């Protein structure tokens, strides 16, 4: 009974935001309304497993990490200072925005409680919320990094409140608190967290606004949270404050602008391009959509329409990821979409999904769901391992073995974001407007909807994303006329994305087939939807068949990294080639246009997947460096989201279409077969991976670095498989001048192992520290089982190495 009452409360309050708003003081809202996730029961194998893992593993694991990393202790410390038990506390984590991770996991746990009652979890939340409430200052201020008053102070935290709007994250933390508090209230009916949030929001509303302090949050998020407070309370000042913060961006009358990084370079209604920090941007665009829907401000809609076009035209990865560069975690310029260095942050993927859902709710156009589906099945779900305990912060489209999922991060925004997003996935499946049901995603599910007085049970049966057959049973309690609009995905219409950024190499003549009660029905598309309006009776069924051939994708020619390359798709899934399936390497493979590719289902891989099989050309270096040997080789690709579950190695989404673009696999060398060890337990695998750098500042391939260590003596060591006679080494230095803090070293020397000791070699020349070239030193031949380089770093800088080669005595040097 308690579960039923909880679901009723959650559903009623969410639906009230859309269906009874005029009676409650809300005059406007989104014209298209999502069916709440609490109403949708997911029954398919693919999503059920992921949702269950999030519920049973990820949420509790994230709370555990918040405890172990001091995030929860921060609230306890702040409470101790506030109560007078301590004069100063100790900030126990790293960043002032760490409070937000706790809030996000609470939000995810609350969503989980809405559909999976758990008294133990509910009690844990009550205890945690009590700690948060105890940390709140008397006037509502809640920001542990300042209340703790730690010595030394936390980075970015100024002496006075709101003193560092650019990086302080006070308002960012508050926004996530509001979202979590609303979720908890809707799930449990308890006000213990909501009252904390409202007290804080009232304080902020008393400080900021017209005639008060003028400022824009450095990191957008509070706007979304304020809108959710408004929806629950109907208190207009929260909506007004959200709009105020948006309108303050680009307004230099009372303050210095933060610039493009924070989308603070222009007023939001004048912005047309996606620039700066990608997560900040996506949250801002989502907040603008919310405020536009609730206020009717068409200038907001016009702006985010322009920005959306800018993104899909040249700033989105084929996986749906956004934010190309790690410099500022930001959007790059048009068509700047590198693969190996792609940032594509998991939080940005989540933000992209949130934004595109809102764009659909504004416009009712399937193109937004096409983008949402792309990111959901590819660049977002890749951010969490199948186990639910390992995470990607960034989601590159190419790897040389330097990437692996992490159990947590010092900046843990992505794992906590995953924990709150996953339970909401069922809420993206269906939507409605008046008497029309929109079927947006194809997931085996059940839902009951009220279509303008028609009570209708919907059951969707499908093995999507592996198979394209979908059956939707429409079961009204009484016969009646209403409409069902079914999205026909863009990928079935030879359009992978709603622009010319990506295209299929060849058109498919296979078309989606629609049947109603077994009879094939012609359909015209209305904004990407097949429209079916009729008098429905119990047991009526809509059947769809989406052909799922393997498709080759090519990029716009301005995407320089993808020239001459192809990506593989099947249905909504983007595929990648990974080393375990392709004889240990991927970079030496070429996939000619005419190669036959076929899909093959594997029940025993990654909880059941469909792979792509075929033949490729494999390139290997011949007897000398200028000779290339090409052979035919079996090829297999797996869904992109499933990579990096079997250890570190090569992976690529984009594959060369001709041999000239593939890398001939070098012959093993004394260096490449050596065991590498490095001071400070650094991973040294990059120094002998045989990838040739373009220059010292090349970030496209792995490199060894000692940053943030500066001014010290460091070392890197090779242990040979057997004693070798060697007479020369070459080092290619990493130097990221203009981007980071690594420089060529002051000096270095080579040593060899003799009787367990390291002895300097007798060198015949100087030890070079030149950039953009190999620095070779020859020495008297020695027989040894290992070499070591000792490297003296510059006083205020770190250092790094791209490649370290070793030459055998008697072998002619190149």
Q: Over which residues does each language-model region extend?
A:
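C-terminal beta-rich recognition modules with glycine/proline-rich loops and embedded aromatic residues
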Residues: 304, 370-378, 383-473, 493-516, ...
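Aromatic (Trp/Tyr) and acidic
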Residues: 26-119, 123, 153-187, 220-237, ...
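Short, surface-exposed beta-strand/strand-loop-strand elements in extracellular ectodomains
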Residues: 172, 497-506, 510-516, 739-755
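Flexible glycine/proline-rich, aromatic-decorated loop/lid segments
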Residues: 258-261, 316-334
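Aromatic, loop-rich ligand-recognition surfaces of beta-strand-rich domains
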Residues: 662-663, 697-814
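Non-cytosolic beta-sheet module surface loops
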Residues: 462, 474-478, 488-490, 534, ...
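Asp-box/WD-like beta-propeller blade repeats and closely related beta-sheet repeat scaffolds
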Residues: 148-168, 194, 199-217
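Bacterial Sec-dependent N-terminal signal peptides
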Residues: 1-25
């Amino acid at each position: 009974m308690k579960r039923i009452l909880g679901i009723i409360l959650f559903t009623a309050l969410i639906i009230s935001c859309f269906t009874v708003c005029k009676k409650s003081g809300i005059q406007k809202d989104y014209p298209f309304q999502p069916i709440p996730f609490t109403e949708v029961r997911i029954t398919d194998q693919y999503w059920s497993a992921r949702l269950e893992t999030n519920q049973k593993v990820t949420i509790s694991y994230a709370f555990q990490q918040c405890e172990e990393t001091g995030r929860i202790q921060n609230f306890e410390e702040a409470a101790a200072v506030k109560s007078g038990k301590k004069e100063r506390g100790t900030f126990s984590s790293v960043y002032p925005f760490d409070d937000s991770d706790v809030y996000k996991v609470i939000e995810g746990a609350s969503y989980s409680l809405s559909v999976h009652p758990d008294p133990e979890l509910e009690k844990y939340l009550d205890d945690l919320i009590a700690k948060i409430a105890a940390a709140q200052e008397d006037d509502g201020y809640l920001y542990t990094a300042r209340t703790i008053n730690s010595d030394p102070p936390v980075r970015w935290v100024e002496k006075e409140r709101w003193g560092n709007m650019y990086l302080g994250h006070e308002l960012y933390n508050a926004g996530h608190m509001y979202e979590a508090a609303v979720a908890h209230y809707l799930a449990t009916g308890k006000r213990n967290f909501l009252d904390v949030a409202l007290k804080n929001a009232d304080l902020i509303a008393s400080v900021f606004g017209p005639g008060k302090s003028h400022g824009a949050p450095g990191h957008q998020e509070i706007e979304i949270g304020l809108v959710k407070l408004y929806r629950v309370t109907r208190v207009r000042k929260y909506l007004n404050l959200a709009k105020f913060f948006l309108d303050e961006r680009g307004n230099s009358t009372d303050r210095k602008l933060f610039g493009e990084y924070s989308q603070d370079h222009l007023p939001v209604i004048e912005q047309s391009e996606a620039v700066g920090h990608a997560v900040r941007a996506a949250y801002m665009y989502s907040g603008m959509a919310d405020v536009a829907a609730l206020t009717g401000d068409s200038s907001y809609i016009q702006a985010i329409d322009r920005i959306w076009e800018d993104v899909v035209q040249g700033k989105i990865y084929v996986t749906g990821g956004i934010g190309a560069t790690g410099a500022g975690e930001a959007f790059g310029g048009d068509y700047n979409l590198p693969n190996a260095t792609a940032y594509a942050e998991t939080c940005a993927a989540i933000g992209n999904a949130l934004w595109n859902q809102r764009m659909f709710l504004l416009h009712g156009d399937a193109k937004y769901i096409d983008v949402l589906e792309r990111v959901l099945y590819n660049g977002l779900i890749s951010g969490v391992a199948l186990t639910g305990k390992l995470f990607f912060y960034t989601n590159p489209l190419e790897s040389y073995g330097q990437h692996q999922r992490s159990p947590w991060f010092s900046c843990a925004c992505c794992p906590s974001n995953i924990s709150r997003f996953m339970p909401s996935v069922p809420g993206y499946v269906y939507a409605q407007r008046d008497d029309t049901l929109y079927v947006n995603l194809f997931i085996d599910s059940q839902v009951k909807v009220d279509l303008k007085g028609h009570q209708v049970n919907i059951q969707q049966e499908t093995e999507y994303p592996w198979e394209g057959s979908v059956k939707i049973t429409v079961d009204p309690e009484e016969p009646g006329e209403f409409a069902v609009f079914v999205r026909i995905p863009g990928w079935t219409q030879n359009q992978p994305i709603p622009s010319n950024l990506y295209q299929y190499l060849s058109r498919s003549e296979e078309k989606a087939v629609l049947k109603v009660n077994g009879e094939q029905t012609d359909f015209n598309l209305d904004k990407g939807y097949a429209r079916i309006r009729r008098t429905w009776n119990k047991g009526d069924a809509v059947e769809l068949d989406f052909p799922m051939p393997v498709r080759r994708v090519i990029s716009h020619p301005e995407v320089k990294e993808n020239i001459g390359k192809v990506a593989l798709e099947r249905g909504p899934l983007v595929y990648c080639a990974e080393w375990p399936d392709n004889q240990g390497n991927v970079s030496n493979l070429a996939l000619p246009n005419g190669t036959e590719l076929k899909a093959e289902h594997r029940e025993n891989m990654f909880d059941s997947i469909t792979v792509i099989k075929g033949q490729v050309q494999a390139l290997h270096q011949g007897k000398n460096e200028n000779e290339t040997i090409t052979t035919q080789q079996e090829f297999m690709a797996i869904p992109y989201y499933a990579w990096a579950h079997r250890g570190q190695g090569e992976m690529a989404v984009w594959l060369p279409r001709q041999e000239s673009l593939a890398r001939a696999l070098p012959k093993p060398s004394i260096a490449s077969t050596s065991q590498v060890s490095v001071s400070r337990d650094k991973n040294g695998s990059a120094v002998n991976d045989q990838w040739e750098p373009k220059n010292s500042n090349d970030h496209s391939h792995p490199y060894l670095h000692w940053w943030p260590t500066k001014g010290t003596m460091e070392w890197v060591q090779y242990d040979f498989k057997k004693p070798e006679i060697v007479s020369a080494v070459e080092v290619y230095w990493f130097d990221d001048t203009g981007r980071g803090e690594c420089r060529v070293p002051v000096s270095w020397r080579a040593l060899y192992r003799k009787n367990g000791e390291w002895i300097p070699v007798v060198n015949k020349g100087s030890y070079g520290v030149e950039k953009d070239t190999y620095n070779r030193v020859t020495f008297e031949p020695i027989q040894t089982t290992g070499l070591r380089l000792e490297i003296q770093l510059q006083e205020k800088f770190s250092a790094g190495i791209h490649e370290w080669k070793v030459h055998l005595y008697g072998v002619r040097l190149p």
